[in-house]
């Protein structure tokens, strides 16, 4: 699955890295279909090539690894495609216009930081409280919010790239004043 997000100033391509998703985030429809398999690097690149054919190669200005699946659970193939985009002959899209979105796989965030590929990173945050995050994002039980925040701070320092936080507001779950205050504290603590 890939999705084109048109905007008057840019065209963003949202690409998938897995068929389904194993994370079972409680607010995400993809989790309902279960996990089938990782996409190969060729299948990931094919999404870009097919949309480029339809829109024109130079029309796609941004890529987000934010479709179906968790990119950092398919790290080898995600990394391989990022390396392809980094090659001189595919420099149509700058790495600074590529964002990898993750639910929070802390060791892989650090690996990506050390890869030398300075792509943008987005953390699907959705709560600043471990207990709430455990309920709505079961992956938090394996890689805690604390671990992930340390990893994204490391990423920002290593890559000199700002971090994006994604936050779906869920009524009576993560929409309280305390949630907002903690989120503001986090944002103020980062460069």
Language model segments and positions:
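Short, well-ordered turn and helix-capping elements at secondary-structure junctions
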Residues: 4-6, 32, 69, 104
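A broadly tuned preference for mixed-charge, low-complexity surface segments
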Residues: 35-54, 118-121
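Conserved AdoMet/S-adenosylmethionine-binding subsite of the radical SAM
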Residues: 52-62, 67-191
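Canonical Radical SAM [4Fe-4S] cluster-binding loop centered on the CxxxCxxC motif
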Residues: 7-43
């Amino acid at each position: 699955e890939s999705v084109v997000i048109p905007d008057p100033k840019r065209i963003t391509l949202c690409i998938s890295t897995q068929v389904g998703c194993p994370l079972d985030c409680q607010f995400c429809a993809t989790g309902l279909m279960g996990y089938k398999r990782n996409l190969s690097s060729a299948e990931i690149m094919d999404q870009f090539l097919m949309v480029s054919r339809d829109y024109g190669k130079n029309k796609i200005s941004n890529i987000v690894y934010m479709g179906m699946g968790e990119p950092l659970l398919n790290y080898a193939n995600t990394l391989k495609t990022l390396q392809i985009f980094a090659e001189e002959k595919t420099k149509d899209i700058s790495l600074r216009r590529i964002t990898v979105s993750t639910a929070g796989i802390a060791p892989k965030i650090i690996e990506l930081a050390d890869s030398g590929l300075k792509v943008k990173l987005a953390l699907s945050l959705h709560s600043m409280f471990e207990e709430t995050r455990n309920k709505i994002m079961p992956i938090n039980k394996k890689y805690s919010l604390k671990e992930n925040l340390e990893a994204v701070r490391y990423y920002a320092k290593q890559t000199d790239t700002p971090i994006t936080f994604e936050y779906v507001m869920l009524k009576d779950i993560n929409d309280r004043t305390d949630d907002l205050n903690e989120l503001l504290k986090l944002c103020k603590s980062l460069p």
